[in-house]
């Protein structure tokens, strides 16, 4: 598959950690208030934060032809798919650090990176047996190492890796819509725009020495604690 990547917009020596991006109100008719416990804990490391809602994502969709139509077709009860895709879009458009609302910074990881060379930060999630992967997920042995989508950062706008991920989400959405499934399984949801996208795209670019993006830094998950509430599974 060929991806046409935009030239990134850089700002020299831009730090990652001036503010944390969280997302809320993607669940239709959300009645719960914004959970502040993790936000307050994370202020010890990064004081500022931004709460992103669907209204912040809509204007970005037109950056990718065909995406507004795909977005509109995502069933409302699968709102987590929009949240998964929305986080990629927002950091692609604006740069910055994304964290799930239930993710706590244990130790500031940005003390270990060089903002001049480590332009995209990803975190390991866990390692699984290949036979534990979902039916649609790539079974290449390298994909046993899963990459988190609950935390990632880019210190410039329009990072090519995020564009690759967004375009892969679009391709996968088209596959699901063309399948005319009566119901999307949990494995479909995790695959279509969830952590399997970042995992697959990371390993694909890292497996070819001629295509490896040296600006991507993979960091151990030990810097974070993901509480993994997974409220979308209750839908």
Question: What do the PLM-derived regions correspond to, one by one?
Answer:
Residues 1-83, 99-235:
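Glycosyltransferase-associated regions of secretory-pathway enzymes
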Residues 84-96:
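Small-residue hinge/turn detector
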């Amino acid at each position: 598959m060929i991806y046409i990547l935009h030239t990134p917009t850089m700002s020299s020596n831009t730090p990652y950690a001036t503010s944390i991006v969280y997302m809320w109100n993607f669940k239709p008719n959300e009645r719960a208030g914004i959970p502040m416990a993790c936000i307050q804990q994370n202020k010890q490391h990064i004081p500022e934060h931004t709460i992103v809602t669907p209204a912040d994502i809509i204007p970005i969709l037109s950056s990718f032809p065909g995406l507004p139509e795909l977005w509109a077709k995502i069933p409302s009860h699968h709102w987590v798919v929009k949240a998964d895709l929305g986080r990629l879009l927002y950091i692609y458009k604006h740069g910055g650090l994304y964290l799930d609302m239930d993710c706590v910074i244990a130790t500031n990881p940005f003390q270990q990176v060089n903002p001049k060379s480590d332009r995209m930060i990803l975190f390991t999630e866990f390692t699984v047996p290949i036979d534990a992967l979902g039916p649609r997920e790539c079974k290449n042995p390298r994909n046993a190492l899963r990459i988190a989508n609950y935390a990632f950062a880019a210190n410039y706008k329009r990072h090519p890796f995020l564009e690759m991920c967004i375009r892969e989400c679009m391709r996968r959405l088209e596959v699901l819509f063309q399948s005319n499934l009566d119901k999307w399984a949990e494995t479909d949801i995790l695959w279509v725009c969830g952590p399997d996208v970042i995992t697959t795209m990371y390993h694909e670019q890292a497996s070819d020495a001629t295509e490896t993006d040296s600006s991507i830094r993979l960091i151990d998950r030990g810097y974070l604690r993901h509480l993994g509430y997974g409220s979308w599974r209750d839908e």
